[in-house]
Structures are given as C-alpha cells and as structure tokens.
Amino acid sequence: CALPIYSGNFSIDDVMRWPDYQYEFGQGLPSNIGPAGSIYEGQPYYSYGKAEDGSYASTSGTSSAYGARFDANRLFYQYDPVTQGRASVATPWVAYKNNRKDLFQTGYTLTNSVALTGKSDRGSVRASITHTKNEWILPNTGFQRITAMVSAQQQISRALRINFKSSYTYRKLNNTPALGYNSNSISYFLIFQNPNVNLDWLRPMWRTGQENVKQLQPYSSFIGNPYVILYESENPSEKHSNVSSISANLRINSKFDFMIRSGIQLSADQREQHRPISDVVFGNGFFKKQNVFDYELNSDALFTYHDSFANGLRVNASAGGNMMQQSYDMLAASVVGLITPGVYKLANGVSNPNVQTVIKKKALNSLYFTANFSYKDKLFLDVTGRNDWSSTLPKSNRSFFYPSVSVSAVMNEWFTLPEQISLLKVRGSLAQVGNDTDPYKTSPYYGTSDFPGSAIVSSTLYNQDFKPEISTNYETGFDFRMFHNRIGLDFTFYYNR
C-alpha cells in the first residue's frame, strides 16, 4: 500500500473587464432646467426631492444620467444618508467612480485532495477525497464541495476481470446569485445605478426604525437594495449525488467476449428561495422549499465476436441488451407573505402553503446488435439494429425498431487510377433513429389545486394512440484527395425525414 498523496490548488477570481461607464453627467434628463424664479433658473440642476418652497421639481426619480455636468464647485441638495431623505444643506456635485466596483470582491477557490492507492499482481484499488471551498466575486456567495471516490479492479482469473467505481459528492451553496433582467439580480441593479450615488449610502439595507420590514431604496422602489439582494434574498441549496458502476468482463475464448455491467446515478437536491418583506415583487415576503430526488439505473449485457479470415475479411460483431429505469420526484411548497420578518419556514406563512408535486417514472428495455465487416481494407460494411420497448408509449405502440446500414469503398484499391490521385473513397448510408416521449402523455390526469380537497383537470389534449418518433436519414458522398493529400475534397449529400 503506497503512502497517501496530497495535492492542493489555490486560485483567485476577479472581474476581468468593466463596461466603460460615464462619470461626466449625473442623474437627470437634459430637460431638467431650473425654472424661472428658482435658484437654478436657466441652468441644469439636480435635486433629491422637490424644493421645500416648491420652486423646482425633483430630478432623482429617473434611472437616466443625462443631467447636470459634475462640478465640485456646484452645490445641490442631494440624498442625506443620516436622515435617509433630502439633505438640508447643499453639497458638492461629484461622481462616485467606484459605486459599482465596490460591490464586488476578489474571490478565491481552494482545493485540497488526498489520494491513496494500493496494488497487487492481480488488482488495484484507489480512494480519494477532495474538499473545495469557493468564495465568489460577490459577497455572501460561493460554495463548498466534498467529493469522495473509490475504484477497484481485480483479475479473478485469466478470463474474468471485475471493475468497480463509485463517486459521492456533497455540495452546499449558501446563496446562488440570480441572473438576468429581474429585480433580485445584481446585474439589474448595476444597470440602474447612477454615477452620483455613493454605494455606502445603501449599506444600512433597512430604513431606520423599520429594520427587516422596509428596505432602503432611496431612488426607486423598482430597484432592490443591492445588500438586501445579497444578504436577504438568498437562494441556498444542498445536493447529495452518487454515481456508481460495477462490471464483469469474461473472455470466453480468442473470438468471444462477454460483458455485464450495471450503473446508477442518483441525486437528492434541496433548494430554497428567500424573499424578505418589502421585496420588489413579493412585498410581504416569500419562502419556497423544494426537494428533488431522481435516479437512473442502467444494466447492460453484451456479447462480442471478432475474427479475421484468410481471404482478407475481418468481422467485429456484438449483440446485447439494456434495461433502463428513471425516476424523478419533486415536492415543492411555498408561502406568499411572512408573519415574522426574516424567518424562512413554511409555518411562518400568513396562509397555508401552496404545494406542488411532480412524479415521473420511466422504463426502457432494449435489444441491439452491431456488425462491422472489412474486406482487405478496401470495402467496408456496417450494420446496426435496435429495438426498444418504452413504458411511456401505449401498449400497442411501445415496441419500435430502428436499423442502419452503411457501405464505403476505397476505389483506388479496386481500380488503377492516375498516380496524382491519393484517395478516392465513396460512401452511402441509410439510418433510422427512434425516440419515445415523456411519461404520462397518453391519458389525462388530475393536477393539484391550491384549494384544499380539490383537483385541476388538465388542459392538455392527450393521445392514446401515441406513436414513437422515427426519423430516417439518407447520406451519400465521397472523399477525394490528390498530390499526396495536399489537395482534397470531402463531399456529403444528406436528406433527413
């Protein structure tokens, strides 16, 4: 048994490139000109809220930044982070050039791994465990992952070999940041952030005296506070997954082999969505919990035959079968409106949870064969066939067969061609591909309803004579090369229906 082997890796992440944001003009529109009789008469101006005497209007309600040009010598009435309202004293009109960049941080990924290997003259085993910790470029994001793997192989006899492999992964994400154009996305906030807004003004998250009830949104109720998005509107998740397989290979003789194999992929995933009170979409708060369990089990058996004959014919053929089972089970419950701010439990909802379930089960049994013939490396023939039996199709249509055949010939091995021609190979094929459908598409089923003790009739028109999808592809072409492969043309014509 060898000594454990340790390996580690550390990397840092940072924003690679920023858009060329402008910091020449502040919040406002070109039409924001001081009216007659005001202190800003005839000039571009800025005002957080309207003047106390009503002599000029507010310009802080727009996300556009085509207003007054920045000038530290000009004084405007701006936002006051102490009072969380309009300042009583005019302050210099300046830009805050880091009011987007300061929202980000330098992230890192740290990976530690230990592996142990053992060998003998008839087998080997290897085990490893890896821990990965990631802090992303946005605060309160990142993940931890633990992966344990073991693999072993043993030569039981000259003819029989056993292989086993298993991998388990646990992944925990404290918060998966939202993406795209929505109110809980930092990208959305960056679009509407104005150059005259100091990011520090938003750090308190909540209005004074209304903690956990009213988020601080000085400029627009349509844009979430970025720190509330990062620290309160969380999307945590935990996932356990396993991939395992075992196989046995039997060499019957010099021409025949037999293989049997079974493998499983399974995962258990728990996801949550937290939305605080005063969220842009869910003003009274929101909580959702979702559990997903799914697995796929595959078992195969395969006979293989290979032989060469004195006349130049080589044959490789195999025939076997597969049994596949799939299962998907999802249970989700959500509440709109929270009784106690900041408590994310289904029991904390102001009403009964809305429960949703999705269960899908599928089985597919298959028999298949493939045969490859080669004659003196100048004529090739490939033939395949597969028959599936699917549980998702009606009983009368659940069996479907799809074959393929292809032939190719190296013409310069059959005929004497000009020496300038390096290769002329022609080919043609006919192939079919079959496909079934998702579970529960042949008959109507009732769905769950928000109203207790009731169900919903599906609006989908189901087909009790659902047939498998069979697509047919025709292909022909040639590969032509000249002057020792310096010039070539590969042509293919195909038709699919």
Language-model-detected regions and their locations in the chain:
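Short, small-residue-biased leader/transition segments that mark boundaries at the very start
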Residues: 1-3
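Surface-exposed loop/interface segments of Gram-negative outer-membrane beta-barrel transport/assembly proteins
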Residues: 5-95, 106, 136-141, 147, ...
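Transmembrane beta-strand segments that form the barrel wall of outer-membrane beta-barrel proteins
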Residues: 8, 129-135, 381-393
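Outer-membrane beta-barrel initiation region
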Residues: 102-106, 116-120
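Transmembrane beta-barrel architecture of outer membranes
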Residues: 111, 143-149, 366, 400-404
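Outer-membrane beta-barrel architecture
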Residues: 113-117, 128, 151, 245-247, ...
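Residue-level signature of outer-membrane beta-barrel architecture
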Residues: 118-120, 131, 154-155, 248-250, ...
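Short glycine/threonine-rich loop-to-helix capping motif typified by GTGT followed
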Residues: 395-399
